Amino acid sequence: MSPPPPQRPSPSRAGRANLFSSPPPPLPNCYDPKHRRPAPPPLPSARRLPSNRRRRHDQPPNPTTGNGGNPAFRAPHLRTAYRKPVPPVAAAGEGEALLAADASDAADGRAVVVGPSGLSFRLPGAPFDFRFSYSECPRAPPVAIREPAFLPFAPPTMPRPWTGKAPLLTKEEKARRRGVRLHTPLGEEAPRTVSAHGIMMEVRGRRKLDLARVSPGDGRSREEVLGEPLTAAEVRDLVKPHISHNRQLNIGRDGLTHNMLEMIHCHWRRQEICKVRCRGVPTVDMKNLCYHLEEKSGGKVIHRVGGVVFLYRGRNYNPRTRPRYPLMLWKPATPVYPKLIQEAPEGLTKEEADEMRRRGKDLLPICKLAKNGIYIYLVRDVRDAFEGSDLVKIDCEGLNPSDYKKIGAKLRDLVPCVLLSFDNEQILMFRGKEWKSRYPKPLTLIPKIRKNNVPMSSDESSSDEATDDDDRLAVREVLRPKMFELWTNAIESSVALMLDDAEVDALTPDSLLTRVEDFSVTSQVVEHSFPAVLVANDESNPDVLNAEYTEDEPETGTLEPQQHEFTESSDVAEDDHFEDDMLKRLESSVPLGALPIDAVVKQLNDE
């Protein structure tokens, strides 16, 4: 039985019925602290609660997102903490390991190769294994990889399900599709009537670019493409126009990457020379960079100045039949490599390494590296510094941490040396216990006078002990023969000053400054002083000219040449004769008072 319908209240005598027994309460004042609601307690993190953790582990996997779904939906992203150890054979550097994310890729020969040279990608028909960077690959086998074994190239098929729509066309593509031209095919008669679809026409379109295609070229070798070697004149003519302009390929910290090979061929399509400008880490080993440029591109480095390389394409280069490689669509994740800094490096104990690190804190750096600079002489400077000290430090303030770590790894292999620390943006290196000097004799920074220039007394020459001491204290000359000769001439002409060890130890900074100031004044006087030459124009007074000879004249009246008098060379005599002839010509050709300066002097004298 349904309930009875609600009855309306009876109207009051005053008129309408009062629906509210009492007036509604006032709205709460949000500014009054009495009416404010208390803040809700913070929500606890779900991952920190042990109950939620147990519930998450006990929960069965979702069938829609499990292993049975499409691999595209369960692919790891940038925030995924992925780390997979490589096979032991590849980690030990004894061989290669092939990794493939899909069985079909492995059957087609598409795989990720992990070996002693790092991470590379193998495609069928490719002349070599592709890498992200060819010149900056570490010389140590990786320990683990940070992403699944996916190839960074366009796949031959699209296994991913379609989840979007076709991309929008650009203005150029729309204009290209609208650009049609009517024509009649060659060899056929023109249609008499027009069909329902119109007359025959051809639509202009861009050739589809196959990003996964590998074309090794026309099969010619690198020597056949290069042709005959260039002469010096041809190299000069090719390089000169490219020195000033900035149409170039810039190589940075990643070195020669895979996609730069396509850029080099794009430069070669319009010009014979590709100018490559290198900065940063790759300039530490320019020889390695030039090798990979020639090996991977097929060109020839014909000129190099500092960090600028000029790459020649070859006499028989054809851009239509050049090799074509697929482009990398993204940068692969860098594998995990062994640590560069170890607590106890090779050949040292932990206590010895800690002591060297403490000594390195007070050591002055040999140089300061600039950001994106050119470091072509860094290896040579480090080797020279190891001749005088067992520890060397390089200041890398302002550089990217990955940059100076790569520089340290290169120095470890090229110098070679032992890396101790990267603290405070500085590279600290030890030359190693098995280090051997490049010179047979010890190094000194003070040039020594040769033995044949030092006078030896009879007692010293006859003493065997003195001879033994000389052989034992024989010091190698740091300077080259030409530079040593210049130093010797400078000391003899009082332009340079050499201090002995005793004088150096006795000098204080103030006395050294005073000594340098006094010597600078003396050297300037010697340098700017010239012998005076007296020329007498009065031939009627021969006594003035012969006054200096009267005292030395013998009684016979003939002049005898002195024993220590130097004879004048033929070249000097010819020069004097030439100067006398020039003076006679000037005196005979220009009369007195004919020059403009003579008029000025006369006017000044009159005033």
Swiss-Prot record:
Organism superkingdom: Eukaryota
Location of the region described as CRS2 binding in the Swiss-Prot/TrEMBL record: 482-505
Subcellular location(s) per record: Plastid, Chloroplast stroma
Region (Disordered): 1-75, 550-576
SUPFAM superfamilies referenced in this protein's UniProt entry, alphabetically: YhbY-like
Alphabetic keyword roster: Chloroplast, mRNA processing, mRNA splicing, Plastid, Repeat, Ribonucleoprotein, RNA-binding, Transit peptide
GO molecular function: RNA binding
Location (main, coarse): plastid
UniProt xrefs under Pfam families: CRS1_YhbY
InterPro entries, sorted: CAF1P_plant, RNA-binding_CRM, YhbY-like_sf
GO process annotations (BP): Group II intron splicing; mRNA processing
Coiled-coil regions, chain positions: none
Transit sequence range: 1-79
Gene Ontology terms: cellular component: chloroplast stroma; ribonucleoprotein complex
Domain CRM: 228-324, 346-442
Physiological role: Required for the splicing of group IIB introns in chloroplasts. Forms splicing particles with CRS2. Interacts with RNA and confers intron specificity of the splicing particles.
Complex formation: Interacts with CRS2 and RNA. Part of large ribonucleo-protein complexes that include group IIB introns, CRS2 and CAF2.
PANTHER family for this protein: CRS2-ASSOCIATED FACTOR 1, CHLOROPLASTIC (PTHR46247), CRS2-ASSOCIATED FACTOR 2, CHLOROPLASTIC (PTHR46247:SF3)
Protein name: CRS2-associated factor 2, chloroplastic
Source organism (scientific name): Oryza sativa subsp. japonica
